[in-house]
């Protein structure tokens, strides 16, 4: 049986607490709670991963370090899996910025991937750097019949959701409405013909039904953490 690809959001960062659009690496560090979240995540796993990777962002590296310490595994940094780049909205925490970020993200979820964050990335930009990393991991490891361990990749909420839904065909209203809390994960399993199946999304398992009434901008404005 092939291993799985586990995409876990980093632990709580100071940027999350401050409700900042903190997307440009290296970015904010983990809070004390974020460190504990990373340790708890590792302790909740039954088996150690065969490979532990993280993005270039400081909060992802720190999360991976804590996980690696629990498993006595050295993490490695990977380019291309950092957060959606907010551009002109970077480091802002005002309602206008949060609303604009989530409005653009909603358009991506609805198929308008060419739309860009002001001064930042489009959905196509994000996928063009993120998906090749996952494809490479599949070809090098998961498609090998002798590889049976999971690959754990510490990344970022908005990027994880977009990439995972694209690969596994998760319905757009579902992934738009279901953010990932700190150290929650999406679990992908390789299936036939190069396709992927999503077997876990945060605390949820399939089927991932469409959400009839989603309000991502309003929800983000009310959320303690508008990212994820």
Language-model features: locations:
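Active-site metal-binding loops of divalent metal-dependent hydrolases
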Residues: 11, 157-158
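Short glycine-rich phosphate-binding loop at a beta-alpha junction
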Residues: 49-56, 145-154
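Glycine-rich phosphate-binding loops at beta-strand->alpha-helix junctions
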Residues: 59, 159-160
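Phosphate-handling substructures
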Residues: 29, 69-131, 200-202, 209-216, ...
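Generic structural signal for well-ordered alpha-helical scaffold segments
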Residues: 39-43, 127, 131-142
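Active-site-proximal alpha-helix that buttresses catalytic centers in soluble enzyme cores
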Residues: 3, 8-73
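Active-site signature of alpha/beta-hydrolase-fold catalytic machinery across serine-
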Residues: 66, 162-166
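Acidic, low-complexity terminal tails and accessory targeting/binding regions
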Residues: 1-3, 84-96, 143-149, 165-228
């Amino acid at each position: 049986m092939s291993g799985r690809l586990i995409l876990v959001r980093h632990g709580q960062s100071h940027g999350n607490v401050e409700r900042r659009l903190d997307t440009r690496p290296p970015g904010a560090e983990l809070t004390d709670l974020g460190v504990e979240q990373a340790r708890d995540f590792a302790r909740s796993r039954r088996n150690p991963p065969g490979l532990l990777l993280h993005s270039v962002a400081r909060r992802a590296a720190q999360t991976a370090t804590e996980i690696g310490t629990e498993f006595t595994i050295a993490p490695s940094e990977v380019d291309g899996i950092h957060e959606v780049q907010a551009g002109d909205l970077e480091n802002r925490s005002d309602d206008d910025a949060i609303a604009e970020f989530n409005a653009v993200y909603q358009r991506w979820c609805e198929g308008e991937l060419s739309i860009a964050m002001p001064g930042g990335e489009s959905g196509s930009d994000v996928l063009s750097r993120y998906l090749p990393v996952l494809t490479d991991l599949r070809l090098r490891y998961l498609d090998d019949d002798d590889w049976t361990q999971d690959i754990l990749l510490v990344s970022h909420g908005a990027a994880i959701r977009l990439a995972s839904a694209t690969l596994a065909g998760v319905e757009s209203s579902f992934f738009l409405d279901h953010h990932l809390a700190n150290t929650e994960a999406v679990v992908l399993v390789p299936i036939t013909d190069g396709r992927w199946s999503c077997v876990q999304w945060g605390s949820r398992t399939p089927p991932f039904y469409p959400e009839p009434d989603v309000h991502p901008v309003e929800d983000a404005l009310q959320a303690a953490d508008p990212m994820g």
